[in-house]
Amino acid sequence: MGGRAATALRSLLFWVDVAGPQGPFEPAFAAEHPIDPQVRVGHVHLRTADIDRVRAFYVDIMGFDVILEARDVPGWGTTGDILFLSAGGYHHHLGFNTWKSAGGPPQPDGVTGLHHVALNFSSRARLAQTVQRLVDAGVPLRQLSDHGTHLAVYLSDPDGNDLELAWDRPFEEWPVYGSAGAPAIDAPLDLDDLLAAA
């Protein structure tokens, strides 16, 4: 995918520039030896059963750019397919491989591992545009929530990896967790109201 669709996606997603403070929260427990406060999640790399299936979902429906796609690549003591995806030209925000998972089933409930990956959008309207494409493609939405700090739409990718598509409210609108006046952090989000912003 290229051209207008790729340009549109680059404007849809943003990856937080951590040059400044990220919000009003004080840590519940401050580490004795704190990590670099500028650290951020650079990318998430997931196992997939089928590169073509995951490519169709993340590129054709979600709108990510393909940075690298290769077959029969050596890795982790075996060979498999790889796919690196980006929004805006970064080396990759999402990576996928079949090194030890080709043809495998989704991870079952009741085991440890990744809970979900959150993708933050730059505006409510841009979140709504992507959710509209998912709805149009028949992708089931698992949960729609207003968490006070952000709006969230939860769904699963073709391998059963859970995704959260989110839009953060401005910091000054965030509730303070634990305060008497803080709203519920898992209030329902109306799909029609969200899609009206598209």
What are these regions (language model features)?
Residues 1-35, 40-49, 84, 105-198:
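Vicinal oxygen chelate
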Residues 30-33, 102-107:
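Short beta-strand/turn micro-motifs at beta-sheet edges
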Residues 90-95, 104, 159-163:
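Short, charged/polar, Gly/Pro-enriched secondary-structure boundary elements
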Residues 97-101, 168:
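Acetyl-CoA-dependent GNAT
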